[in-house]
Amino acid sequence: MSDNPDTHDLNSDVLRLYSSTGHEFVLSRKMSYVSGTIKSMLSGDNSNFMEDQNNEIRFREISTPVLEKVIQYFYFKNKYTNSTTDLPEFPINEKVVVDLLLAAHFLDT
C-alpha cells in the first residue's frame, strides 16, 4: 500500500479525532481530507507531525457537538462532491453556528 495519503482506500486507514472533552471519533483518513489542515498534518512520507504517526488528532478547542458536526460534514462533502443529484440541506443547530464557523476556519474546511 502506498504511503501517499491521496492513494489510501476510503475504508483502509482509520483516524481517531478527539474533542476538547476527550470524546473519540473514528473515521477513515480519506474522509478527513475534506479538511486542508488535517490533510496537511497527515501528508505521508514527509510528515513530521506526531498525528500522522499515531493516527490520532486531539482538538483542545473543539467541543464534542462541534467536532461531531464537522465529521458529519466530511461525510456529506464526500458523498455529494461531483454528484448529479440535488444537494440536500446540511442541517446545523443554531446553538453551535459560531463555534462551527470557527472550527471550519481552523480546519480549512
Swiss-Prot record:
GO terms for molecular function: protein-macromolecule adaptor activity. Its main location: nucleus. It is found in: Nucleus. GO terms for biological process: ubiquitin-dependent protein catabolic process. SMART domains: Skp1. It comes from the Eukaryota. It holds the Pfam family Skp1_POZ. Keywords: Nucleus, Transcription, Transcription regulation, Ubl conjugation pathway. One of its GO terms (cellular component) is elongin complex. Belongs to the SKP1 family. PANTHER family: ELONGIN-C. SIII, also known as elongin, is a general transcription elongation factor that increases the RNA polymerase II transcription elongation past template-encoded arresting sites. Subunit A is transcriptionally active and its transcription activity is strongly enhanced by binding to the dimeric complex of the SIII regulatory subunits B and C (elongin BC complex). This is Elongin-C. It comes from Dictyostelium discoideum.
